[in-house]
């Protein structure tokens, strides 16, 4: 019986289900839609009628009798890096961040486009750093992932 249990845990990690859930949520950069991207694309604020399109999430604002629509999509994660005091950056490892009491995180970027009814063409789509996401060790975005 002991051999069976040892064999099972050699093939599967104790935290395999947690890694799978985390990897399902985060954008992997392989072109597939992550759960995070699906949530962003499903956002509809200020719109009464459900709209199905590929333009991404939408926030509709009425400001001073002008309609402004903010479209958002393509959420992305960068690789975990450490920024030193002098501005230099290098790839982070979980051990380095733990020893230096830093957070092991990746920057999160998303594309935004603003459409105004008083302008004939929408503004250019712009990638914006919206925050940082802690990275789970050995996840698909971890620098130790093979």
Segment roles from a protein language model:
Residues 1-145:
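Conserved N-terminal architectural modules of multi-subunit, DNA-dependent RNA polymerase core subunits
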